[in-house]
Amino acid sequence: MTDLRHYDVIVSPVITEKSTMVSEHNQVVFNVARKATKPEIKAAVEALFGVKVTAVNTAVRKGKVKRFRGLIGRQSDVKKAIVTLAEGQSIDVSTGL
């Protein structure tokens, strides 16, 4: 049974040219909560998608500085998780949870 906390950990799938390329190597890319840890991300992916996760790599993309009408603002930082799945496992990220 999935815990409601798992839905707070995984924010959205990342669908870019680079994430499509790594999907050929049994990897899936997600935007995750800023405070999520690797064990939490692993547990959430295994519970929500029913797959076996072998590794989780994370990276924090710093937000860009933007200007609007002379005011300087900053976009939020985004944490990205590259999840490696066990051999033969796959996730279709084009469908919803």
Swiss-Prot record:
Pfam families for the chain: Ribosomal_L23
Gene3D superfamilies: 3.30.70.330
Entry superkingdom: Bacteria
UniProt keyword annotations, A-Z: Ribonucleoprotein, Ribosomal protein, RNA-binding, rRNA-binding
GO molecular function list: rRNA binding; structural constituent of ribosome
Any GO BP annotation: translation
Matching SUPFAM superfamilies: Ribosomal proteins S24e, L23 and L15e
GO CC terms in record: ribonucleoprotein complex; ribosome
Similarity comment: family membership: Belongs to the universal ribosomal protein uL23 family.
HAMAP family assigned to the protein according to its UniProt record, in alphabetical order: Ribosomal_uL23_B
Biological role stated in the UniProt entry: One of the early assembly proteins it binds 23S rRNA. One of the proteins that surrounds the polypeptide exit tunnel on the outside of the ribosome. Forms the main docking site for trigger factor binding to the ribosome.
PANTHER family in the cross-refs: 60S RIBOSOMAL PROTEIN L23A (PTHR11620)
Binding partners and assembly: Part of the 50S ribosomal subunit. Contacts protein L29, and trigger factor when it is bound to the ribosome.
Entry protein name: Large ribosomal subunit protein uL23
The gene coding this protein: rplW
